[in-house]
Amino acid sequence: MPRNSRLDLLAERLAEQREEGTEAESAPEFLMARRRERRPSGAEGAVEASIYVRGAPAPPPADPADPAEVRRRLEAEPEAVAWIRMDRPSTGRLMAAAREFGLHELAVEDAIVAHQRPKLDRYGDTRFAVLRAAGPGGGADEVRFSEVHVFTGPRFAITVRHGDAPDLEAVRRRLEGDPQLLALGPQAVLYAVADRVIDDYAPAVARLGEAADEVESRVFAGDPEASPRVHRLLREVILFQRAADPLLDVLRRGLEQDAGDEELRHHLRDAADHAEAVAERVDGHRQLLQNVLQVNATLLSLEQNEKMRRLTESDARQADNAKKISAWAAILFAPSLIGSVYGMNFRHMPELGWALGYPMSLLLMLGIGVGLYALFKVRRWM
């Protein structure tokens, strides 16, 4: 089946999915949970296009938003290279570019649906890369993620950005300020975008590191609010790893596929080194937070054990006090019982007429009291 026909079928299927509300189901769960980098649906951004000839900027196309116009410029100038920059494009606009430049329908679908894992795929002479940008978010413990897709072909590069990062205008200025790099062709665009993504990681990584150090101090200081923050930070770091770690694989695959261009390999190797350094720092933050989480759990366990020990000691003291009270109550009860019996003053009580009745009753009270005291003392109730 011709590629344009497959693209038409893809457009119809995506339209049906949007009507049924099932388009987002194909996105990975961990990415669907983080949509704060996305603007409201329907907020389509601008489309820009640049033409370069032998590493130097050329006059832009008359209508940068028309991929057919860009294609005609490339056909008219055999040495020209085009870079089309799309910001949250509509399905129709991306489909139009796909038809003009022969983009593979699977890559186009990924670019439309978005929420993809970082990767580098090759479809014939066209490559498709997914990169996840990251930067400091609104909160102290928050990282803001964006997504950019890069199509590269023999004489063109198309970037599709979902979110506000990376700053593609800064990438354009850098490329135009380095004619030797720009002369390497469309792959230079992929390298420059990836390098910008890696550079943008630095502030976010630094903020995560500061937050991790701060929460570590709070944990050892016994701050009860530290535990939820440790969990939040650890979640941010894990999401950061899922965005940054695959980028290293993307760059390494680019090194393997660009074996013939030594200059480009040099740039990709440098970017891969930076990506590896970022990955190591993020992994260090993750290990630190995991250790802090374990220490926090240990401290909480010790605190709970101490509370239980105090409760046990308190219960034991209460039990001892109850025993002492019960023992004294029993000791005092016997004399009280004897006194109560003989205090009833009935006429026919033989002991009342006995001369030794009074001293004997006192001795009986004292003897029972002493006996009970000795018994409770032996049983350690006193």
Question: In which residue ranges do the predicted regions lie?
Answer:
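Alpha-helical transmembrane anchor segments
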Residues: I331-M382
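Divalent-cation
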Residues: P2-Q180, L184
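Membrane-associated alpha-helical segments
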Residues: R155, V197, V205, E214-Y342
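Alpha-helical transmembrane segments
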Residues: A194, Y201, V278, I368-L375
